[in-house]
Structure formats: C-alpha cells, structure tokens
Design a protein with these regions (language model features):
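Solvent-exposed, charged interface segments at domain starts and junctions
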Residues: 5-8, 31-32, 49, 53
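Short, conserved active-site loop motifs that form the nucleotide-linked donor/cofactor pocket
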Residues: 25-27, 40, 90
Length: 144
C-alpha cells in the first residue's frame, strides 16, 4: 500500500497478494487489526482514543484496553503489569526493536535502544511469564 500511495500508477499492478504470503502458510491481517491469541492482543500498535494515535506507554495501554497487549511501533521496550478484579494477570509490552545497526531516522537518544526478542512462556488466559532475549546474547550464542 505504501508504494501505491507514493506512486498511484502502481494501483492494481502490485499488492500484498503478489507476495503469496497466505499460499506459503502465513496468516495475514490488516494493519492495526488486533490479533488475539490465548487472550493476549497483538498489534503493530494500539490506539489511545478516537484520534487513532498510538498509546504512549505500556501502563497506559493496559488502562485503555483492559487486557494483555503486545505491540511494536516504538524503539524502546516498556513493560507494565496489572491485575483484573478476578485476579487475572495482565501484561502490557512494547516489544522494542531488533536492529543490528543504527537507523538514520533515529536520534542519538534512540539509536542504541535495547534490541532483542521476547519469549512469552506459560501463556494462559491472558497471563504469561515474559522473557527478554537481547540481540547481543543471540549473536554471542549463535554467531553473526
């Protein structure tokens, strides 16, 4: 869509279907369509209200969405925890980045942010035990 928006001549010539992701077994969702798996919602980002802007913190995401949520979009990682009245644990997670390099569009304050992946263990009813794994650890263990 971004290429077509930048150059309308491409409209109808290229699209996500050309990538044949579904034919290769991928589940494909529309941008910002939350995907809920085991009572945890996943999205590129979650909105803070009717203006459609991204939430600014993991804590605010829990307050706005009332369920465990994991999102990308921002360079820094952020984690928040809450508990529902019924005792169910909730996780709010900004996943951060997985860059091995600095990005030109980032500032000196945001280049160098933590970079890695998250493993969600013991996922059940929206709760889990989150485990960060840094890119540095992965590179040391498995090589460049």
């Amino acid at each position: 869509e971004r290429a077509v928006n930048a150059d309308p001549k491409l409209d109808g010539l290229i699209g996500f279907k050309d990538l044949k992701l579904e034919e290769m077994g991928w589940e494909v969702y529309d941008f910002l369509e939350p995907v809920i798996i085991d009572d945890i919602a996943y999205s590129h980002y979650f909105t803070s209200g009717v203006m459609g802007r991204p939430v600014s913190s993991a804590k605010l995401m829990l307050q706005k969405k009332y369920m465990s949520c994991v999102m990308g979009h921002v360079q820094d990682r952020d984690v928040a925890f809450a508990r529902k009245a019924d005792g169910t644990n909730m996780l709010g997670l900004f996943a951060g980045i997985f860059y091995q390099h600095d990005e030109d569009y980032l500032t000196p304050q945001t280049n160098g942010s933590w970079s890695g992946i998250w493993i969600l263990n013991e996922v059940k009813d929206g709760g889990c035990d989150e485990m960060p794994v840094s890119i540095n650890y992965l590179r040391e263990k498995y090589g460049d």
